[in-house]
């Protein structure tokens, strides 16, 4: 089922003609209709809904009621609308579903009108235009999923969870999202719309996909499951540097690095309970008669290590870290999108044991700042992402100053999602979300304070009196999945490209940092000498020794976003200098090679290094994409 929900000043319709041979019988009174101050729900019932119409009705009513509460609507207009899908259900099934939705909404106390089914209708609608005024929902019955495999927490959330959305300013003002003035905060507006609509389906290819293919970084792998990618040498270099960078930052912060298995037993008592808190989207592996699932995070392995460890209050906060290569999650095929949403991904995952809420909140703030620092290092500033903070109403009342301080640290308004009661294992969570060129958002950094899993897994520490206590646990990924960081970097550069600016990777991440171009074969030896000096200084350099004309060689380097282009001819060889084109500012300068080495070293100081991923000479390189 597809639904388009519009909060409107009014919706009115008038029947014009039959759209089906046997439409729903109607009276003269039903040929026209109008409701004011209404939530208009345009619905396409789909073929897949025929598998379990009753389930679809229940889910649809829950979604409609959720939105109605958010926009404070007491009137609902159910409007059959075939144009939201190309895979429609049989007319008799669709009509029955629509009637039951109408009936159940009336039972809940709403004033409901339903437009006739099977007719062409003229309609007028006045949308209110606030951030919650236009939302979409997709509902799919869980055909073939046995009762015991269904996700307990997810079912509960669908029935009971109601989110209240606000914008919190750095000054501490909490404003209902539909009353906030988004002027000057267009990216936040896009994020709010995406977050509330919950539409994860990718209907177009995001620009980063074109860039990852053009630059021969990453590609789809037809020999594997969808959402499992292949990395060419340049892409593997970028990914490897990011993995090393985040790991170094987390270890520097004080985490102990561990390694744990990628698969776990479905029947392990603690894991079975934990799985019930997550959607049933695991890869399943069988070994003999036993069934295992591939991990979707490092939680399992780290929790089991902590369970077996003897931990004193003197050891707290205790930070443990693993870079999972890989974590797995069987996302729906329609949600898969380049590097943004995958089925196999690399997740930097730190878990911190804290003795009490005070220590946990202190760590939370430190890890919030750590996440900002990590993203800044990959070229993403607070202007490039939006913040969401999630908690219960009680937590807000008890910790307002702490939450406001988070908004002050980031220096701009943030999205707040608040609940009346806690449905999840955490009491506080934040994410830094990147909004891409298709107005889709993806969570990067995140930290959560977990109040359930210590007891669930039997993780304890000994306090000052020698008594065993259950700690709190913080889940932290300071960057988010490495693939998503690559996605965000490429999408940011695509935005700059669309604005007529020169895109480029951060210098420390550029697969080739310097390209040396000899004007002729006569100076190839000097070009190789220059390249040797740069390589000796741990700078990634290559030499264009192809037969292309000089202008074409320069254009080729520009197209590859090479930060420094050195053109060498007889003058440079005789004077032992280099002529350098800087991509960053577009300037061309003549300088000593030592000065260029010093400049690059200064700009890459503090970041990891890996050697050139491809042969030195361009003529020796294979082409990975036709």
Swiss-Prot record:
Its cofactor is Zn(2+). The keyword DNA damage does not apply. Gene3D superfamilies: Anticodon-binding domain, Bira Bifunctional Protein, Domain 2, D-tyrosyl-tRNA(Tyr) deacylase. It is an enzyme of class 6 (ligase). Keywords: Aminoacyl-tRNA synthetase, ATP-binding, Cytoplasm, Ligase, Metal-binding, Nucleotide-binding, Protein biosynthesis, RNA-binding, tRNA-binding, Zinc. One of its GO terms (cellular component) is cytoplasm. It is found in: Cytoplasm. Binds 1 zinc ion per subunit. CDD domains: ThrRS_anticodon (cd00860). GO terms for biological process: threonyl-tRNA aminoacylation. Zn(2+) binds at residues 299, 351, 475. Residues 1-144 are annotated as: Editing domain. InterPro entries: aa-tRNA-synt_IIb, aa-tRNA-synth_II, aa-tRNA-synth_II/BPL/LPL, Anticodon-bd, Anticodon-bd_dom_sf, DTD-like_sf, Thr-tRNA-ligase_IIa, Threonyl-tRNA_syn_edit_dom_arc. Residues 207-506 are annotated as: Catalytic. It comes from the Archaea. Its EC number is 6.1.1.3. One of its GO terms (molecular function) is threonine-tRNA ligase activity. It catalyses: tRNA(Thr) + L-threonine + ATP = L-threonyl-tRNA(Thr) + AMP + diphosphate + H(+). Belongs to the class-II aminoacyl-tRNA synthetase family. Catalyzes the attachment of threonine to tRNA(Thr) in a two-step reaction: L-threonine is first activated by ATP to form Thr-AMP and then transferred to the acceptor end of tRNA(Thr). Also edits incorrectly charged L-seryl-tRNA(Thr). Homodimer. The N-terminal domain is an archaea-specific tRNA-editing domain that hydrolyzes incorrectly charged L-seryl-tRNA(Thr). Catalysis of tRNA editing is performed by the charged tRNA itself. HAMAP family: Thr_tRNA_synth (MF_00184). This is Threonine--tRNA ligase. It comes from Thermococcus gammatolerans (strain DSM 15229 / JCM 11827 / EJ3).
């Amino acid at each position: 089922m597809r639904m388009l929900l519009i909060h409107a000043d009014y919706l009115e319709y008038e029947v014009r003609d039959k759209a089906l041979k046997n439409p729903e019988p109607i009276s003269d009174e039903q040929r026209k209709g109008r409701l004011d101050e209404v939530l208009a729900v345009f619905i396409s019932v789909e073929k897949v809904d025929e598998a379990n119409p009753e389930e679809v009705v229940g889910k649809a009513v829950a979604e409609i009621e959720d939105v109605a509460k958010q926009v404070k609507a007491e009137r609902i207009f159910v409007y059959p609308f075939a144009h939201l899908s190309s895979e429609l259900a049989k007319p008799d099934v669709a009509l029955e579903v629509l009637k039951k939705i109408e009936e159940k909404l009336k039972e809940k106390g709403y004033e409901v009108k339903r437009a006739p089914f099977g007719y062409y209708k003229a309609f007028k609608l006045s949308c209110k235009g606030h951030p919650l005024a236009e939302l979409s929902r997709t509902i799919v019955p869980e055909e073939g999923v046995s009762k015991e495999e269904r996700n307990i927490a997810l079912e509960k959330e669908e029935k009971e969870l109601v989110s209240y959305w606000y914008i919190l300013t750095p000054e501490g003002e909490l404003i209902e999202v539909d009353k906030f003035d988004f002027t000057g905060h267009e990216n936040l507006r896009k994020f709010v719309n995406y977050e509330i609509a919950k539409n994860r389906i990718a209907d177009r290819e995001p620009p980063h996909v074109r860039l990852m293919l053009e630059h021969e970084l990453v590609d789809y792998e037809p020999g594997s499951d969808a959402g499992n990618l292949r990395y060419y040498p340049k892409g593997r270099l970028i990914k490897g540097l990011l993995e090393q960078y985040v790991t170094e930052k987390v270890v520097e912060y004080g985490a102990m690095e561990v390694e744990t298995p990628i698969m776990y037993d479905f029947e392990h008592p603690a894991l079975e309970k934990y799985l019930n808190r997550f959607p049933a989207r695991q890869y399943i592996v069988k070994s003999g008669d036993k069934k295992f699932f591939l991990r979707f995070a490092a939680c399992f392995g780290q929790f089991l290590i902590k369970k077996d460890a003897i931990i004193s209050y003197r050891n707290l906060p205790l930070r443990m870290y693993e870079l999972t290569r890989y974590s797995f999650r069987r996302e729906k095929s329609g949600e898969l999108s380049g590097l943004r949403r995958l089925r196999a991904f690399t997740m930097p995952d730190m878990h911190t044991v804290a003795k009490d809420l005070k220590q946990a909140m202190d760590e939370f703030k430190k890890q919030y700042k750590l996440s900002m620092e990590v993203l800044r290092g990959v070229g993403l500033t607070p202007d490039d992402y939006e913040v969401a903070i999630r908690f219960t109403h009680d937590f807000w009342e008890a910790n307002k100053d702490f939450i406001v301080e988070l908004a002050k640290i980031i220096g701009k308004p943030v999205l707040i999602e608040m609940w009346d009661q806690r449905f999840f294992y955490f009491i506080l969570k934040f994410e830094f979300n990147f909004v891409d060129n298709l107005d889709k958002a993806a969570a990067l950094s995140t930290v959560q304070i977990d109040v359930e899993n210590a007891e669930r897994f039997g993780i304890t520490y000994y306090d000052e009196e020698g008594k065993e206590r259950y700690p709190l646990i913080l889940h932290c990924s300071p960057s988010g999945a490495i693939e998503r960081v690559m996605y965000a970097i490429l999408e940011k550069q695509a935005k700059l490209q669309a604005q007529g600016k020169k895109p480029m990777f951060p210098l420390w991440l550029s697969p080739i940092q310097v390209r040396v171009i000899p004007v002729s074969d006569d100076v190839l030896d000097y070009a190789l000498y220059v390249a040797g000096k740069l390589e000796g200084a741990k700078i990634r350099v290559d030499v264009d020794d192809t037969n292309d004309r000089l202008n074409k060689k320069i254009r080729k380097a520009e197209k590859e976003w090479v930060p420094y282009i050195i053109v060498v001819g007889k003058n440079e060889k005789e004077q032992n200098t280099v002529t350098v084109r800087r991509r960053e500012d577009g300037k061309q300068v003549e300088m000593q090679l030592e000065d260029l080495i010093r400049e690059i070293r200064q700009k890459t100081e503090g970041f990891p290094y890996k050697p050139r991923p491809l042969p030195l000479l361009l003529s020796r390189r294979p082409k990975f994409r036709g």
